[in-house]
A protein has these predicted regions:
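Short Lys/Arg-enriched alpha/beta "domain-start" segment
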Residues: 1-61
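Residue-identity detector for glutamine
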Residues: 3-5, 11, 57, 88, ...
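Proteins with a high burden of low-complexity, intrinsically disordered sequence enriched in S/T/G/P/A and R
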Residues: 4, 106, 123, 178, ...
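Aromatic-residue detector
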Residues: 8-11, 16-17, 21-22, 59-62, ...
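Generic detector of short, locally flexible boundary/turn motifs and exposed helical patches
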Residues: 33-41, 79-82, 98-99, 135-139, ...
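N-terminal [4Fe-4S]-dependent radical SAM core
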Residues: 51-131, 138-148
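An intrinsically disordered, low-complexity acidic/polar region
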Residues: 129, 160-162
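Core AdoMet radical
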Residues: 136-155, 162-203
Length: 203
């Protein structure tokens, strides 16, 4: 099985983790790549389901050699490939002057992508006729894993730290829909301008 086949299999069937304590933490439910963990196969890092029902039934498991610190991917006890897990980013240990943890403002996706939902509420969410069927934007907020509104200053501060401490190379910004006039375009633009004024980071 080549590297691309391994990645396709993992993303389709998930990965059964014997221990959750490997690599950066994943999260159950909510917006973004929830129920997943970042996994590196060869030179490619992808998000793989680990907390889903399918992953619990997956034939793929990880075995970790605690003496060497390396991991291998197994299928029916046969070694398929060496794999690794990106570690918890350093910027997760920081907080703003107001005491907000950086991870409530933006998260690391994969190994080098910073992601944030600028406005965590949406006027469409509570109406089944207008809500996006895939969206779980309010779940993260209800679970206390994020803040409702990220300010331009907060986002610039976190982005600078993520680049400096963890080598983040680009950023994704999404938002809930706050109104029917510009749908949040002006505010997300203000946030993007604050970030690029502080750090050179493709958004």
């Amino acid at each position: 099985m080549n590297q691309q086949q391994v990645i396709t299999e993992l993303q389709s069937r998930g990965l059964k983790l014997v221990s959750d304590g490997v690599g950066a933490s994943g999260r159950k439910g909510g917006a973004g790549p929830s129920d997943h963990k970042a996994v590196t196969v060869g030179d490619t890092t992808v998000m793989v389901p680990v907390f889903t029902e399918g992953a619990a039934q997956s034939p793929y498991v990880v075995e970790r050699d605690h003496t060497t610190g390396t991991s291998v991917l197994l299928k029916e006890k046969e070694i398929i490939a060496p794999i690794s897990f990106p570690t918890q980013p350093k910027f997760y240990g920081l907080e703003t002057a107001e005491g907000i943890p950086y991870w409530k403002i933006a998260l690391l996706h994969s190994r080098n992508v910073l992601a944030t939902t600028v406005l965590q509420n949406c006027i469409r969410y509570d109406n089944r006729k207008t809500a996006c069927q895939f969206c779980a934007i309010s779940q993260s907020l209800e679970a206390g894993r994020t803040s409702a509104k990220k300010t331009p200053e907060q986002l610039a501060e976190v982005a600078e730290a993520a680049v400096r401490l963890d080598g983040v190379e680009h950023m994704i910004m999404t938002t809930g829909t706050p109104n029917v006039t510009d749908r949040g375009a002006a505010y997300i633009t203000e946030c993007a301008q604050a970030i690029t004024a502080r750090i050179s980071l493709p958004i």
